[in-house]
């Protein structure tokens, strides 16, 4: 497994893994596949997404994209977003590698994320890297907040 930071020139790989994540595991995201298909499915839109402030990472098995995660700056630090690992690549440490890439990129900044309430696999992966579920109910999108306490 190889985790790489990606940019606008990697738009086709990001498109592949993002659309796959939203198609195969729609319940894991507040976003939907319709936000990234149809009229919005253009090279310009994908390049723009990968040009936004922050960083995007793809996990590769050989040359095949099998996971993704993003990191974006916020007023309070950095937010980990859009984490996903392909079903055939799960339980191989890829999720941990993607989380570690964001932790390294954030370089000591306060890290937060939102996770769909009840997503046990994601909660376990995040907890293994020091994230703690915050008190309170799920938001309007069914998400709970986790913070990384260092």
Name the predicted role of every residue range.
Residues 60, 83-90, 115-118:
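A short, internal acetyl-CoA/4′-phosphopantetheine-binding micro-motif in the GNAT/acyltransferase core
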